[in-house]
């Protein structure tokens, strides 16, 4: 069957929040554990919900650390977030061609909307499934299934596009096709080991996969 539905991860996929996220983790690490953790540790934390990352450090202070992270993140958001080349044009083309589009992210809705609006992507998405909308996050299929239900989509006509293992595994668990961006911060070799159906060198590659000619 032809693909008519695209579920997108947000961070590291549609918008380049890598330096913002790393900066926010480093700020939080330094606040609670001065000199103990560095950039590599911050990169390891990218992907899962904040609560999972901070729970490994100190289960007793998770909420406090999440609040510290988010305060720094929101304060520096617009300065550190950057667009990825070809993303806006690709999403716009899919929207104009009548594709069903949704965001499936482990961010809270407020922060997700902040990123989408920064680059004018919010107008293309009627469905956003965020951390505060689900009981279970990727790689559990719940958020993907919730997005598909909201869109009236069939799994055999859907593809999940992301930049990390939980996006690929979440797609597989939901029974949909998967695509991963080759510009993922952990590198293409890392994401390939999770066996995505497609690897995108850049976002416009997605148009070929779903049968749309780039303009």
Curated annotation (Swiss-Prot):
SUPFAM superfamilies: HAD-like (SSF56784). CDD domains: HAD_PPase (cd02616). This is Pyrophosphatase PpaX. GO terms for biological process: DNA repair. It is an enzyme of class 3 (hydrolase). Belongs to the HAD-like hydrolase superfamily. PpaX family. One of its GO terms (molecular function) is phosphoglycolate phosphatase activity. Hydrolyzes pyrophosphate formed during P-Ser-HPr dephosphorylation by HPrK/P. Might play a role in controlling the intracellular pyrophosphate pool. Its EC number is 3.6.1.1. It catalyses: diphosphate + H2O = 2 phosphate + H(+). The active site is at residue 9. InterPro entries: HAD-like_hydrolase_sf, HAD-like_sf, HAD-SF_hydro_IA, HAD-SF_hydro_IIIA, HAD_2, HAD_sf, PGP-like_dom2, Pyrophosphatase_Ppax. Keywords: Hydrolase, Magnesium. The keyword Signal does not apply. Its cofactor is Mg(2+). One of its GO terms (cellular component) is cytosol.
């Amino acid at each position: 069957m032809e693909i008519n539905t695209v579920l997108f991860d947000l961070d590291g996929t549609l918008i380049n929040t890598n330096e913002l996220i790393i900066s926010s983790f480093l700020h939080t690490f330094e606040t609670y554990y001065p000199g103990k953790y560095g950039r590599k540790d911050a990169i390891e934390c990218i992907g899962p919900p904040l609560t999972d990352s901070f729970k490994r450090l100190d289960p007793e202070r998770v909420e406090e650390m999440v609040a510290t992270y988010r305060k720094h993140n929101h304060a520096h958001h617009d300065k550190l977030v950057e667009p990825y080349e070809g993303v806006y044009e690709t999403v716009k083309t899919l929207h104009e061609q009548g594709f069903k589009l949704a965001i499936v992210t482990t961010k809270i809705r407020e922060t997700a909307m902040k990123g989408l609006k920064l680059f004018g992507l919010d107008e293309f998405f009627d469905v956003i499934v965020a951390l505060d909308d689900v009981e279970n996050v990727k790689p559990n299929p719940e958020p993907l299934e919730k997005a598909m239900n909201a869109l009236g989509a069939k799994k055999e006509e859907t593809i999940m596009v992301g930049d990390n293992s939980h996006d690929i595994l979440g797609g597989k668990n939901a029974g949909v096709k998967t695509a991963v961006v080759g510009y993922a911060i952990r590198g293409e070799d890392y994401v390939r080991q999770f066996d995505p159906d497609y690897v995108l060198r850049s976002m416009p590659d997605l148009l070929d996969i779903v049968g749309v000619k780039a303009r």
